[in-house]
UniProtKB/Swiss-Prot annotation:
The gene is HIPP25. This is Heavy metal-associated isoprenylated plant protein 25. Keywords: Cadmium, Lipoprotein, Membrane, Metal-binding, Methylation, Prenylation. GO terms for cellular component: membrane; plasmodesma. Its main location: membrane. The lineage of its organism: Eukaryota, Viridiplantae, Streptophyta, Embryophyta, Tracheophyta. A lipid is attached at residue 150 (S-farnesyl cysteine). It comes from Arabidopsis thaliana. InterPro entries: HMA_dom, HMA_dom_sf.
Amino acid sequence: MGVLDHVSEYFDCSHGSSKRHKSLQTVDVRVLIDCEGCERKVRRALEGMRGIRDVTIEPNAQKVTVVGYVEPNKVVARIIHRTGKRAELYPFVPYDVVAHPYASGVYDNRAPTGYVRNTEYDPHVSRLARASSTEVRYTTAFSDENASACVVM
């Protein structure tokens, strides 16, 4: 990165058209990878895409990690278009991140070991994974830690 690139960030010479810079991000995509040929096909489809810096493929976890200045939906569309394989954004996160990893909407048998379904993208599932306000009220009503709790017991 030269001096001209550094100085051009401070001055806008575009004459009305604004160019939005994409940020460097990591995109995880779930793709069914059966063999080394499938792995090579996915890698070649992504390496030709503009803005991609690194492609890492984990065939056992059915996971492709892309690092670069790209949009996640464009990466998924490129994999689907070029390879003909079904692809989606990686729906699993490590179980340490989720508050209730064994709730009915979060736990998934098809998830790799140590991962559960991401509740951030599906609001219906996330509602099941959290305790409701009435549920919290009932559990704290008889708590020893609550000073204004009921002393029936």
